[in-house]
C-alpha cells in the first residue's frame, strides 16, 4: 500500500494490544469500535495520537518543548504516514472560571472586533447617537436647508491659559474677529467690551465667537467657504462648532457639532476591542474584575425555595423567634407599598423584588437586615449567621455582564454585546441573519460576520443551539464540551491533520446524530483524516472504514477482528460488532414491564429551564429519563430529584434545585446514590480490587498462612499503601519515575523489587503456590476460578460482581488511572452489587452506556435487573435506545433544548412514549420497537 494514502501502524503493543498492524486510510472518516476494554483507546489515543503529537512536538526547538507536555514514544515497531494529530476528548477541558462558550469557540473575540469596528455609542441620558463630527457633517447640515436661508457659524468662547473673558476678547479682536453672539444677540466685540467694563464680567454667559455669516447655497464656492469657516470654528472653540439658522418668522434653530466623542456633557470612550474584554483591565468591571460574581449575600441561600411567598417564610433568615420581628415589620409596611405578600417569590416582578431586597431607607428589608448583622459582627452568633448566607452572588455593579458600564452604551443592531451573549445560539443566529447595516458598515464587518456566522452554524450543527455564549465552560457536561471543541476545530479549518475523537455522540439525542455525522464529514472534506472511537450504530454505519478490536476485552482483546467498510461484513464473524450490525445478536426487550404502585413525585420543579413540572419516579423498577440535549434531564434528576432526596436521607449540605415539594412514598426508600463516571481514585495505588473491598479479604487470607503467622506478619503487612511488607524503594508502586527536563519523564521498573511492589520476604508467603503479587497479576476471571477451586467463598463473593458487570478481564492490581470512564462506572456498580444492602436504595446513573459496546450494554442491563430484584430502584439519564426500550417507565423531557425545553413531553412505558407524536424520543423508539 502506498504511504501517502494510508497511516501504517506496525506491531503496536500498547497496554493490551497484541502486536497488531493496521492501515488506516488517510482523508477518510474511520470508526474504531469494539467492547469496552478491548483496546480501542490504546490504539486511537495511546498509539496514534501519542505518536502524531510527539512527532510534531519533536520538530520544535528544545526551548519551546519545555513548555509543552513531554511525550513518550508509544510501544510500536513503526508508524508511517502520520499527520499532526489533534485529540478531542470528553474531558471538561476548562477549569478556568473566566472561560465561557463564547471565548472557547472564539465567537466572543469576533464579537469584540465587530463592536469595536461598527458599534454605535448611545448616550445613556438622552439616548442620542454619540458621534465625532467633521467639517463634512456641518456642510451636510447646511445642504438640508432651503437655499437662501440665513445662518451663522459660531464657536463657543473659552478664555484660555487663565485669562479673563475681557482679555480673551481683546486677543480675538486683534486676530481679526469682529463680532460675538451674546444670549442670541449679535454684537460688535468692542461694544461688548465696553458693556463688560461698565457692568463687570458675568458669572455665566453664553458667549459665542461669530466666525461667519452666510446664506445656504449648494454651489461649490459656498461649500468651500463653509468648510473653511467650520474648521476655524472648531479650532477656536476647542473642537466645538455651532450653526444657527434663522427662519423667515424670526425663530432660530441651533445645531451643535464636536470633534470630541461626547454628548449631553459626557465624554465617552471610543470603542476598542479591549473595551469589550472581561479579561483585560480596560474592559473588566472594576468591582468583580471581570468574573461577573462577587462574594456577597447569596440570593439562593436567603431564599432557597422560590415557590414560597414572603408570608409563608420564603426569606429564611427571618425565621425563628428573634429574627421574625423583621418579617412582622416588613409585612406591616408592605401594603402601603403595594407589595403582594402572598405571591410566590418566583412570580414577583423585578420592581417588587427590589423592594423586598433594598426597600425604602431605614425600613425592614433584606439589605438592612444584613447591614444590622454586619454592624454587630463582634457577637459570634451574628458572625455565624452572616457566614451562613454568604456565597457567590451576581456583581451589583455590572449585574453579571462582567464589563464596565461604558461597554453597554455601544450597540450593533440596537443590542449591546452583553445582550447578545445572553441569547441562546439559535436566537443569536436569527439576530445576525436579520442584521441591517449601511454600506460602509457592511463592508467593514463583512469578514467578521462571515467568521461569526460560520461558528454559530457549527454550534447549531453539533446540537448546541440551546447554549448561550456566556455559559461558563466548567459548567458544561463532557459531551457538550467535546462538541464545543469539535465546533472550534471546524472554525479553525485546519487542513491535512489527524483528528481523533472519543465518542462524540455522548449526550446527543438520536435526533442530532445525523447532524453530528454531517459535521464529521465537513471536517473530513476539508482534507483531514477523522478517527472516531464510537459505539453508536448510526455513526458506525456512516463511516468509510471500520476497525473493530476484540474479540473480547482486556487480555481476551487487543486483536483486530474486522477492518473494512460496511459492504464487506460477513455473517458468522467472531466480532460482536459485526454480529450486532448484521442483526445476528440483538438486545431483546423484556416481554413485560414490571408493574408499580409506589412512587416519589417531584412537584413544581423549576430549576434552570424546567417549567414548574410535576414528575413521578416509580419505585422498584427501572426508569429512564430521556430528551434532546439541554432539555433539562440532568437538572431534573441530579439537581432536583437526587439532591432533594439526599437531603431527606442524610445531612446533605448541597442545595437542591428549585421545586415546590417532594411527595409520595419517600420513607419506603432509605438512601439514594449517584453513580457517575469519575475515576474511582486518582492515585496510581487505587485499583478495582481495593474499591470492592476484596483486597481486605485477600490480605487476611495471607496473614493466616503458617509462614506469615510464624514471622508475625499481619494483614497490614500485605498492603502496598503502608510501610511493612511493601518495597520501600518504590513505596509499593512497582515503578520509579525519573524526571527529565526536555523529554518525557522516564518510568522505570523498580530495581529493588523488579516491579513486584513487595519485599522478597513478603513474596515468600504463598497460598496454594501463589504469592500476593501473583494474585494481583490475575484477571478477575482467573482469580474467581482460582479462589473457587480453593474454597475461598468470601473472596469470590466480593469479586463476582466485577465479573457480573463485565469487568472479568481487568487485572486485580490494575491501577484505576488506566480504567476508562465506562469501566469506572461499572466498578462502582459492582461495589453496590457486592454490598449486601438490604435497605431499599435508589441508584441514579448518568449515561451509563458511555464507552459501552452493544454487548456490554446487555451485561449492564443484567446488573440493573439484579439490583432491582433486591428491592432497589434504578433511575437513568440515557439516550441509548437499547436501554430506553428495556425500561419499565420512560420520562421524556423537551420538546427542544434550552428555553424551548424543560416540559414533560411524555411519561409511561416505552410503547406508550413511542405513540407520542410530539416526542422526538418516541419517534426513534417506534423504529427500535418494530
Q: Which stretches of residues belong to each language-model region?
A:
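Conserved phosphate-binding elements of NTP-dependent enzyme cores
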Residues: 1-930
Amino acid at each position: 500500500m502506498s504511504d501517502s494514502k494510508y497511516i501504517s501502524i506496525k506491531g503496536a503493543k500498547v497496554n493490551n494490544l497484541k502486536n497488531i498492524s493496521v492501515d488506516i486510510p488517510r482523508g477518510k472518516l474511520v470508526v474504531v469500535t469494539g467492547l469496552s476494554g478491548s483496546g480501542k483507546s490504546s490504539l486511537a489515543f495511546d498509539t496514534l495520537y501519542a505518536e502524531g503529537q510527539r512527532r510534531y512536538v519533536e520538530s520544535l526547538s528544545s526551548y519551546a518543548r519545555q513548555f509543552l507536555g513531554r511525550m513518550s514514544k508509544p510501544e510500536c515497531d513503526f508508524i508511517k504516514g502520520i499527520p499532526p494529530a489533534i485529540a478531542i476528548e470528553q474531558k471538561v477541558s476548562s477549569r478556568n472560571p473566566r472561560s465561557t462558550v463564547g471565548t472557547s469557540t472564539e465567537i466572543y473575540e469576533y464579537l469584540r472586533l465587530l463592536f469595536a469596528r461598527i458599534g454605535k455609542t448611545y448616550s445613556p441620558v438622552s439616548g442620542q447617537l454619540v458621534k465625532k463630527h467633521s467639517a463634512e457633517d456641518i456642510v451636510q447640515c447646511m445642504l438640508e436647508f432651503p437655499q437662501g436661508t440665513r445662518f451663522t457659524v459660531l464657536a463657543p468662547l473659552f478664555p484660555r491659559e487663565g485669562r479673563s473673558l475681557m482679555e480673551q476678547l481683546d486677543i480675538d479682536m486683534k486676530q481679526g474677529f469682529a463680532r460675538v453672539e451674546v444670549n442670541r444677540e449679535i454684537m460688535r466685540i468692542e461694544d461688548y467690551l465696553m458693556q463688560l467694563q461698565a457692568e463687570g464680567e458675568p458669572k455665566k454667559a453664553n458667549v459665542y465667537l461669530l466666525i461667519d455669516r452666510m446664506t445656504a447655497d449648494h454651489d461649490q464656492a459656498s461649500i468651500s467657504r463653509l468648510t473653511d469657516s467650520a474648521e476655524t470654528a472648531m479650532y477656536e472653540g476647542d473642537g466645538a462648532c455651532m450653526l444657527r439658522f434663522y427662519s423667515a418668522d424670526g425663530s432660530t434653530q441651533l445645531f451643535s457639532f464636536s470633534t470630541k466623542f461626547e454628548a449631553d456633557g459626557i465624554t465617552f470612550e471610543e470603542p476598542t476591542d479591549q473595551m469589550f474584554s472581561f479579561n483585560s483591565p480596560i474592559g473588566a468591571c472594576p468591582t468583580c474584575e471581570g468574573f461577573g460574581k462577587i462574594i456577597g449575600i447569596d440570593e439562593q441561600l436567603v431564599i432557597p425555595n422560590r415557590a414560597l411567598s414572603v408570608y409563608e417564610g420564603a426569606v429564611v433568615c427571618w425565621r425563628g423567634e428573634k429574627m421574625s420581628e423583621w418579617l412582622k415589620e416588613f409585612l406591616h409596611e408592605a401594603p402601603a407599598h403595594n407589595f403582594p405578600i402572598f405571591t410566590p417569590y418566583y412570580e414577583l416582578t423585578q420592581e417588587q423584588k427590589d423592594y423586598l431586597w433594598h426597600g425604602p431607607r431605614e425600613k425592614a428589608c433584606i439589605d438592612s437586615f444584613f447591614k444590622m448583622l454586619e454592624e454587630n459582627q463582634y457577637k459570634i452568633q451574628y458572625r455565624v449567621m452572616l457566614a451562613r448566607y454568604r456565597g457567590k452572588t451576581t456583581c451589583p455593579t455590572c449585574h453579571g455582564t462582567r464589563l464596565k458600564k461604558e461597554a453597554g452604551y455601544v450597540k450593533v443592531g440596537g443590542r449591546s454585546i452583553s445582550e447578545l451573549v445572553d441569547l441562546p445560539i439559535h436566537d443569536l443566529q436569527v439576530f445576525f441573519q436579520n442584521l441591517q447595516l449601511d454600506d460602509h458598515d457592511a463592508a467593514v464587518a463583512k469578514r467578521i460576520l462571515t467568521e461569526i456566522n460560520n461558528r454559530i452554524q457549527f454550534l447549531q450543527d453539533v446540537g448546541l443551539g440551546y447554549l448561550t455564549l456566556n455559559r461558563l465552560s466548567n459548567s458544561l457536561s463532557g459531551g457538550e464540551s467535546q462538541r464545543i471543541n469539535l465546533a472550534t476545530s471546524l472554525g479553525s479549518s485546519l487542513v491535512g491533520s489527524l483528528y481523533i475523537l472519543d465518542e462524540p455522540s455522548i449526550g446527543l439525542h438520536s435526533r442530532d446524530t445525523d447532524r453530528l455525522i454531517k459535521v464529521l464529514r465537513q471536517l473530513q472534506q476539508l482534507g483531514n483524516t477523522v478517527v472516531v472511537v464510537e459505539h453508536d450504530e448510526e455513526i458506525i454505519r456512516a463511516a468509510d472504514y471500520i476497525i473493530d478490536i476484540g474479540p473480547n476485552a482486556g487480555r481476551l482483546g487487543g486483536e483486530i477482528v474486522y477492518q473494512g467498510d460496511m459492504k464487506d461484513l460477513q455473517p458468522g464473524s467472531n466480532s460482536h460488532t459485526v454480529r450486532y450490525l448484521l442483526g445476528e445478536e440483538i438486545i431483546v426487550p423484556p416481554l413485560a414491564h414490571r408493574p408499580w404502585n409506589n412512587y416519589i413525585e417531584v412537584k413544581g420543579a423549576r430549576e434552570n429551564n424546567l417549567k414548574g413540572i410535576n414528575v413521578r419516579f416509580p419505585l422498584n423498577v427501572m426508569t429512564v429519563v430521556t430528551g434532546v440535549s439541554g432539555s433539562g434531564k440532568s437538572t431534573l434528576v441530579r439537581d432536583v430529584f437526587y439532591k432533594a432526596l439526599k437531603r431527606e436521607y442524610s445531612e446533605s449540605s448541597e442545595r437542591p434545585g428549585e421545586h415546590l415539594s417532594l411527595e409520595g412514598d419517600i420513607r419506603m426508600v432509605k438512601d439514594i446514590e449517584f453513580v457517575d463516571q469519575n475515576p474511582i481514585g486518582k492515585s496510581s495505588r487505587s485499583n478495582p480490587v481495593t474499591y470492592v473491598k476484596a483486597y481486605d479479604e485477600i490480605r487476611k487470607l495471607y496473614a493466616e498462612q503458617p509462614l506469615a503467622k510464624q514471622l508475625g506478619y499481619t494483614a497490614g503487612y500485605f498492603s502496598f499503601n503502608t510501610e511493612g511488607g511493601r518495597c520501600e524503594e518504590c513505596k509499593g508502586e512497582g515503578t520509579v519515575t525519573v524526571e527529565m527536563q526536555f523529554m518525557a519523564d522516564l518510568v522505570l521498573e523498580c530495581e529493588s523489587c523488579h516491579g513486584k511492589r513487595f519485599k522478597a520476604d513478603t513474596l515468600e508467603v504463598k497460598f496454594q503456590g501463589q504469592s500476593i503479587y501473583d494474585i494481583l497479576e490475575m484477571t478477575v476471571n482467573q482469580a474467581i476460578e482460582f479462589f473457587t477451586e480453593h474454597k475461598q467463598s468470601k473472596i469470590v463473593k466480593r469479586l463476582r460482581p466485577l465479573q457480573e458487570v463485565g469487568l472479568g478481564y481487568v487485572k486485580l492490581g490494575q491501577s484505576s488511572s488506566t480504567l476508562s470512564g465506562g469501566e469506572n462506572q461499572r466498578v462502582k456498580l459492582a461495589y453496590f452489587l457486592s454490598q449486601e444492602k438490604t435497605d431499599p436504595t435508589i441508584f441514579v446513573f448518568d449515561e451509563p452506556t458511555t464507552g459501552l459496546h452493544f454487548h456490554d450494554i446487555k451485561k449492564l442491563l443484567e446488573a440493573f435487573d439484579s439490583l432491582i430484584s433486591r428491592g432497589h430502584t434504578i433511575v437513568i439519564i440515557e439516550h441509548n435506545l437499547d436501554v430506553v426500550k428495556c425500561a419499565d417507565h420512560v420520562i421524556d423531557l423537551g420538546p427542544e433544548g434550552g428555553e424551548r425545553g424543560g416540559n414533560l413531553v411524555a411519561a409511561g412505558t416505552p410503547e406508550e412514549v413511542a405513540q407520542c407524536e410530539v416526542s422526538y424520543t418516541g419517534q426513534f423508539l417506534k423504529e427500535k420497537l418494530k
